[in-house]
């Protein structure tokens, strides 16, 4: 469901705090979420690629090097649908473009690396990865987002 439709539908039925997530990596994205009616923006993948994140360096680098086309959406690994970096799926010995049907009975890493596990070896990431170009301290990411938010707000006021 498009976030434009979703936030409006939620607002019709719910007067509480609405938190929007998905593909947000900048202050402009946060402003857009607020303009759609969300109270807060929930940002995930951007903060994996920070100096303080408890993720291995290869995971952070893969995020920086990826685009939205490098994301596979599947429930194969955990039983719950999720977005994963295709490169990490390949590294586990699987073809991300030809994954077997999602079924816990068919989950078998024995044909590839026997110890591959979701989140440790198969890395989650959202479709906004293509807009992440660096690994910075969290403080710098937040400061940049604040500047971007203010600049986007200024641009809207100027138009």
Where are these regions (language model features)?
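Conserved active-site-proximal phosphate/metal-binding subdomains
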Residues: 2-19, 24-159
